[in-house]
Amino acid sequence: MLRRSKEERTLKENLLLASSTALAAGITNVAGMIAFLAFTTNVTGHVANLAKHIVEQNYRDIIVFLVWLLLFFAGAFLSSFIIRSYKHTSDYKAHSIPVVIEIIVLLFVAIYGHNFYSETALEREVVIGSIMFAMGLQNSLVSTVSGGLIKTSHLTGLFTDLGGDIAEWFHPKARKTVTVRDKIYVRLTILGFYLAGAIVGGLLFDLIDFAIFYIVPVILLVILYYDLTIIKLRKLKRRIDQ
């Protein structure tokens, strides 16, 4: 899922990356909403709330929303910076480092929320900020790896792109190319798995509370392990062939 980027990627690799990261984003967003009463991937909504607080001159809330937005931006910036820095050595290494950082951040959220969270305003703001940083990392990573095709938490853009792709597919004067078909498959996969993750997040939070945040790092570890398994199998095959 992380070994190749952009045009080198197969449909299978894009579908696997889209489904796993969209599932993780859906779980995180809904669990964050239930736990902290804030959508942790809804940057558009946070900008709207920021504008509202500016109008109402709620200075503390203005600072909070600015920090949240900056943390999402920081996650996206860091992810892209790391990928560009390590791209010349190994695609897998360049793409896996942001995932490892995301796992660490979400484990912090899971451990703190499950064991120490006492529902104070400051704790809530710090945890939401941490999740937004992690989602910035993930969004930037999958977008960069897929050449902008996959954005697992940006559903407004997803519906816009999906509408355009389906219009192109059904238009009588447009060619029904494999590229357009594959884009539709990927976008529908993101939508379906994000919705599934959101449903799972809502149901499981009632049962296991903050322990649900342990599930997302497990999904991300599976993404890392999937590519490591393929790399090991290829090395084994080369040894056998020799």
Q: What are these language model-derived features?
A:
Residues 2-242:
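Alpha-helical transmembrane segments of multi-pass membrane proteins
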